[in-house]
């Protein structure tokens, strides 16, 4: 399988996962997806380490064994955690420099012979056109490796710069370009504003509402996206995007049909209201397919530029995380969560607004969400028992139906304008962690005093 085919297969699989899971935080979901794929691949390679060594193949070019001062006993500090050659180490300012100032530039007597059958090489040095050299391994039979009798001298260890949280020895995959959300409020960036009719804005709003990337945008962000969309016309047979090119626009089809080709073979077609081109913008990866206008009368698309696309999605995610992290700190039932767990929970929450008299949950209905009250007040009532209690900011409801897979045990009604943060059933047990046990211990079902 070629690199392009491999990338296309990975991106197609990711697209299926995105459609199936419909995550609130798309960026976090995709990062977790590729991290889990990497972890699985590395685990499989590690299991083949002994067989590979027997065949003369070095899956992990590294220095696994460093001899102690006796020259015979092997130090096992890195035996299970081999030191990997970083493809970015020479130019990465975040690298950790694993050497002492008085270390020699090279390990004395280090073998000059390169591995003959390396599967993975660090040849992606940033800012360089020449591949970086693989790590040299110490020759255990070389007497020059014996440490000096001087106890002040440290054993010779080659320099190895490893970026923080770097996973080495695999092909590089998609990666998002660096953007710092903290600078958003201080820079001078302004989104483009195009002259659209009221009818066009309404139609585009409907289209964005059905797209998983923009579904959770607030009113202001959605307005910015709509006004930034520019109309582009293509004749029959025109290439809208080309496989392997850098992504510059995200497209929504207004009129006509677009055919998609991978390595010259047609793989799909899309019509009015469909969108394409988002993955290359999100992850700074090459276009996975070629899109060709396939209507005799031409194709009309709405296009969103790369910077606005990434800026809106990233800024929104960043601001939501900050807002929800502050809010979740004040929710007592979540006090057992770590800051990292709260951050993950914050990314999964979505906001819903209800007005006075609205029924947020109804007794007898199937429960699908767990709710935290951000602002406003609600009353909890049950058939035959009337109003049971009132809830306000920081209170929660909806847990009983999810904990016990039961219908809603009560009705929750908004007493004024209420803003709630919601968490779906799939994320309830996955993200609440130890808080689930606390919720179970407080389950009011047995006492018939349930609030949901």
Swiss-Prot record:
GO terms for cellular component: cAMP-dependent protein kinase complex; chromatin; cytosol; nucleus; plasma membrane. Residues 95-106 have a biased composition (Basic and acidic residues). Residues 74-163 are annotated as: Disordered. Residues 75-84 have a biased composition (Polar residues). GO terms for molecular function: cAMP binding; cAMP-dependent protein kinase inhibitor activity; identical protein binding; protein kinase A catalytic subunit binding. 3',5'-cyclic AMP 1 binds at residues 278, 287. SMART domains: cNMP (SM00100), RIIa (SM00394). It comes from the Eukaryota. A nucleoside 3',5'-cyclic phosphate 2 binds at residues 333-451. A nucleoside 3',5'-cyclic phosphate 1 binds at residues 213-330. CDD domains: CAP_ED (cd00038), DD_R_ScPKA-like (cd12098). The keyword Phosphoprotein applies. It holds the Pfam family cNMP_binding. Residues 28-212 are annotated as: Dimerization and phosphorylation. Keywords: cAMP, cAMP-binding, Nucleotide-binding, Phosphoprotein, Repeat. 3',5'-cyclic AMP 2 binds at residues 399, 408. PROSITE patterns: CNMP_BINDING_1, CNMP_BINDING_2, CNMP_BINDING_3. Belongs to the cAMP-dependent kinase regulatory chain family. Tetramer, composed of 2 regulatory (R) and 2 catalytic (C) subunits. In the presence of cAMP it dissociates into 2 active monomeric C subunits and an R dimer. This is cAMP-dependent protein kinase regulatory subunit. It comes from Debaryomyces hansenii (strain ATCC 36239 / CBS 767 / BCRC 21394 / JCM 1990 / NBRC 0083 / IGC 2968) (Yeast). The gene is PKAR.
């Amino acid at each position: 399988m070629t690199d392009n085919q491999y990338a296309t297969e990975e991106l197609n699989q990711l697209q299926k996962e995105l459609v199936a899971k419909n995550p609130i935080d798309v960026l976090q979901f995709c990062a977790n997806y590729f991290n889990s794929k990497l972890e699985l691949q590395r685990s499989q390679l590690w299991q083949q380490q002994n067989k590979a060594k027997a065949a003369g193949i070095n899956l992990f070019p590294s220095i696994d064994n460093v001899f102690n001062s006796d020259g015979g006993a092997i130090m096992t500090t890195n035996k299970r955690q081999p030191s990997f050659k970083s493809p970015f180490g020479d130019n990465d300012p975040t690298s950790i420099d694993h050497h002492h100032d008085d270390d020699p530039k090279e390990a004395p007597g280090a073998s000059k012979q390169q591995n003959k059958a390396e599967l993975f090489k660090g040849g992606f040095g940033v800012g360089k056109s020449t591949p970086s050299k693989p790590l040299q391994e110490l020759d255990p039979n070389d007497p020059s490796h014996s440490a000096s009798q001087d106890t002040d001298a440290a054993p010779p260890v080659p320099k190895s710069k490893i970026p923080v949280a770097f996973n080495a020895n695999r092909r590089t995959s998609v990666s998002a370009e660096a953007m710092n959300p903290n600078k958003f409020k201080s820079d001078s960036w302004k989104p483009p504003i195009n002259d659209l009719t009221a009818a066009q804005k309404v139609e585009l709003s409907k289209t964005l509402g059905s797209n998983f990337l923009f579904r959770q945008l607030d009113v202001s962000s959605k307005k910015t996206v709509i006004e930034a969309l520019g109309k582009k016309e293509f004749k029959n047979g025109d290439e809208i995007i080309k496989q392997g090119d850098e992504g510059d626009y995200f497209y929504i089809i207004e009129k006509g049909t677009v055919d998609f080709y991978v390595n010259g073979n047609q793989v799909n077609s899309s019509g009015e209201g469909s969108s394409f081109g988002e993955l290359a913008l999100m992850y700074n990866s090459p276009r996975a397919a070629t899109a060709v206008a396939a209507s005799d009368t031409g194709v009309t698309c709405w296009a969103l530029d790369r910077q606005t696309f990434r800026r809106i999605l990233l800024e929104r995610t960043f601001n939501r995380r900050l807002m929800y992290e502050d809010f979740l700190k004040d929710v007592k039932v979540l006090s057992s969560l770590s800051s990292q767990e709260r951050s993950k929970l914050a990314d999964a929450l979505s906001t819903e607004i209800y007005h006075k008299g609205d029924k947020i949950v109804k007794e007898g209905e199937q429960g699908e969400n767990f709710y935290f009250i951000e602002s406003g007040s609600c009353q909890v009532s049950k058939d035959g028992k009337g109003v049971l209690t009132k809830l306000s900011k920081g209170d929660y409801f909806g847990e009983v139906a999810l904990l016990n897979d039961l219908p809603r045990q009560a009705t929750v009604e908004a007493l004024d304008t209420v803003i709630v943060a919601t968490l779906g059933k799939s994320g309830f047990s996955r993200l609440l962690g130890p808080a689930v046990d606390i919720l179970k211990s407080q389950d009011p079902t047995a006492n018939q005093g349930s609030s949901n």
